[in-house]
């Protein structure tokens, strides 16, 4: 096999004993990877093609029992999402690219990425992303971060309090949620409580639709606390509290590029 240089032997037939097999549902419904080291394989062909290493990553995920993938970011996600879907994987999105939309500065490099000034253009990118993926199996990631995976207020200084920041993110999530629901009534949603978003959530400044899966992240070193960079307090708990309702997930870093 590719990852351990195993050579597959072709057999003319395979015997499968007759019988009844009972399989239990997986305890974790959605199980997958984000290819965090995508830049390390983006120019690798393994002597075959640029797609081949990605196909082998997706195959490895399937062999490990996974069913979901974030197939890279930016241009990569639009190249490799169809390959992942064709191999039977569901697709979701990096939290810096809600709904899998194109980054604002990629689409409008000469404009300031301010939702106050250009909200209609952000909405257009999100709507285009919904149209592009509406016929695929997608877990829709909603939220709002700044360009380059930073807090959005680094691009828009008008939002200078937690209340203002949380209100805008909450309103945007509701809008994204409605966009998808209009096209896909039974859509599944998630959002990442990571970095500054975790702080706003803990402060009670975020209003998230009740059926959205809340994804909690470790700090990059395996501890379920706030991110090691850019947070005011690096020890904020990043786990749901006892009695919390709704659905929850974990974004756990095996590597941190």
State the predicted function of each range.
Residues 31-35, 62, 68-71, 91-94, ...:
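Hydrophobic faces of well-ordered beta-strands that scaffold small-molecule active sites
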Residues 49-79, 83-92, 135:
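Catalytic domains of carbohydrate-active enzymes, especially glycoside hydrolases
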Residues 86, 90, 94-119:
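Acidic/aromatic-lined carbohydrate-recognition and catalytic surfaces
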Residues 38-45, 66, 111-113, 153-163, ...:
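Glycine- and acidic
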Residues 1-59, 63, 147, 175:
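Solvent-exposed alpha-helical segments and adjacent loops
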Residues 6-16, 74, 78-86, 113-245:
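Gly/Pro-rich turn-and-neighbor structural signature
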Residues 103-107, 148-154, 244-257:
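Active-site clefts of carbohydrate-active enzymes
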Residues 28, 32-33, 37-51, 215, ...:
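Active-site-adjacent "gating/activation" loops or surface patches in catalytic cores
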